[in-house]
């Protein structure tokens, strides 16, 4: 019979309070090449590795999220976009400016243009300001400023600002490049314009009214990310907006690169409102086609609630232009929670037409319907009565009955829900087990 082997006993306990006892063996590893040579990975290579790793982690996380909850996967990107992430995204896009190949992701979707009803367009023209002054551009402003400073330049058609001749020659060459630009890298001199104190004068030398659409798109990306709100507002108002309106009126549609430039301009929503939306409505010459194209950008893109409220309040107080109703309707359909001040301003806006003898366009009635549908519980009782009086004078055979129904079938601001609903709430029965009634029993 074979001899039994002795059991090996470990004298050390499995769990010890002393950290020095529970020491584990370290496996010897072969040193890596850069460790053996005592060299570090270069900063550029390290940054590329980190970017690639983060991209892969995000891709894996998105796939796992899509498997767990397919219905919400489509909205994951939109819901996760915060202000900091938007800044990071824009910085990455700025790094990719030199890689621009002239193509856009959503170009196939843009080809489906919305048709404009000619009758509606003629009705809108009756609300336009016939005596409105022409819109000023950056060139007009700089020329006027130069001529006011120096009377000797009054006879020159396009005078040059007083600068170093080398700088003037350089940026005139940049302007010629921008007029022919389609794809590829932009000159480094152009990227430095945003850091200059007199950037408007330098930009004037490049003749921005002659830039190609793709060049204006690239310029909008650079200016939106590097200039402050007040500065980029002037770029939007005096460079981007005149070019967009000119392109729409000339071709009856908007070049896709200019459309993308408008979308990029929404990165600074305050500057977009002050530089594009408000001047457009204030001009009194915005036609229906311009409103539909620019309004589609507001419809597709996300706008912060605060800026949306400010825009609605300002539009409600402006002198009415037919297309103002279109922008009001688009912003109301965002369904943001509005302050009472904005809601009261909108009521006052609609009540201005109670004595107007003109036939209001359909979009005016639709904007009123949208307002009542979204915020009927936040309108005062007196304001609802005033709106009903308005609807007796401004009628539409299809829209007006819907507005009246919404006004009647809703509670007023400050009122609670119908108290009749609480009467049907179940009341727990009280039972006394010591006071049980006698139950008669039948005898057999």
UniProtKB/Swiss-Prot annotation:
Protein name as catalogued: Bystin
Pfam families noted in UniProt: Bystin (PF05291)
Keywords for the protein's UniProt record, in alphabetical order: Nucleus, Ribosome biogenesis, rRNA processing
Tissue: Highly expressed in flowers and at lower levels in roots, hypocotyls, stems, leaves, siliques and seeds.
Annotated stretches, region: Disordered: 1-37, 53-85
GO CC, alphabetical: nucleolus; nucleoplasm
PANTHER family, per database record: BYSTIN
Subunit structure: Component of the 40S pre-ribosome.
Gene3D superfamilies: 1.25.40.480
Compartment annotation: Nucleus, Nucleolus; Nucleus, Nucleoplasm
Function: Essential protein required during embryogenesis and pollen development. Required for processing of 20S pre-rRNA precursor and biogenesis of 40S ribosomal subunits.
Skewed-composition ranges (Basic residues): 24-34
Any one biological process term the GO annotation gives: embryo sac development
InterPro entries associated with the record: Bystin
Family, per entry: Belongs to the bystin family.
Knockout or disruption consequences: Delayed pollen development with reduced nuclei content leading to reduced pollen germination capacity, and pale seeds with arrested embryo development at the globular stage in homozygous plants. In heterozygous plants, slight accumulation of the 23S-like precursor P-A3. Reduced siliques size with small non-developed and early aborted seeds.
Biased composition (Low complexity): 73-84
């Amino acid at each position: 019979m074979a001899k039994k082997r002795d059991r090996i006993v470990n004298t050390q306990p499995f769990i010890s309070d002393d950290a020095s006892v529970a020491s584990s063996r370290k496996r010897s590893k072969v040193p890596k090449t850069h460790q053996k040579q005592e060299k570090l990975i270069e900063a550029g290579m390290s940054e590329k590795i980190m970017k690639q790793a983060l991209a892969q982690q995000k891709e894996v996380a998105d796939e796992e999220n899509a498997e767990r909850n397919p219905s919400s996967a489509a909205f994951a990107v939109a819901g996760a976009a915060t202000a900091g992430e938007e800044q990071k995204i824009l910085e990455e896009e700025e790094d990719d400016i030199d890689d621009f190949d002239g193509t856009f992701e959503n170009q196939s979707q843009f080809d489906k243009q919305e048709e404009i009803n000619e009758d509606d367009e003629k009705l809108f023209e009756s609300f336009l300001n016939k005596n409105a002054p022409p819109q000023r551009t950056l060139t007009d402003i700089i020329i006027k400023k130069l001529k006011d400073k120096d009377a000797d330049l009054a006879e020159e058609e396009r005078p040059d600002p007083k600068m170093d001749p080398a700088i003037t020659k350089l940026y005139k060459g940049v302007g010629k490049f921008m007029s022919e630009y389609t794809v590829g890298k932009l000159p480094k001199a152009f990227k430095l314009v945003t850091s200059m104190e007199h950037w408007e004068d330098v930009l004037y030398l490049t003749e921005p009214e002659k830039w190609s659409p793709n060049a204006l798109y690239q310029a909008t990306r650079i200016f939106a990310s590097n200039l402050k709100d007040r500065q980029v507002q002037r770029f939007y108002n005096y460079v981007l907006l005149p070019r967009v309106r000119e392109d729409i009126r000339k071709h009856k549609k908007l070049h896709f690169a200019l459309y993308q430039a408008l979308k990029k301009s929404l990165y600074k929503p305050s500057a977009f409102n002050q530089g594009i939306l408000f001047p457009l409505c204030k001009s009194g010459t915005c036609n229906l086609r311009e409103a539909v194209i620019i309004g589609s950008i507001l419809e597709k893109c996300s706008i912060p609630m605060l800026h949306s409220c400010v825009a609605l309040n300002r539009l409600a107080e402006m002198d009415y232009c037919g297309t103002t109703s279109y922008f009001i309707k688009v912003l109301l359909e965002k369904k943001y929670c509005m302050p009472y001040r904005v809601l009261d301003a909108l009521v006052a806006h609609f009540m201005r037409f109670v004595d107007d003898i003109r036939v209001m366009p359909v979009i005016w009635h639709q904007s009123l319907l949208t307002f009542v549908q979204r915020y009927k519980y936040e309108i005062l009782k007196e304001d609802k009565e005033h709106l009903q009086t308005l609807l007796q004078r401004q009628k539409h055979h299809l829209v007006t009955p819907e507005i009246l129904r919404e006004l009647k079938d809703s509670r007023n601001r400050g009122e609670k829900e119908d108290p009749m609903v609480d009467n049907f709430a179940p009341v727990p029965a009280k039972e006394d087990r010591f006071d049980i009634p006698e139950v008669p029993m039948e005898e057999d």
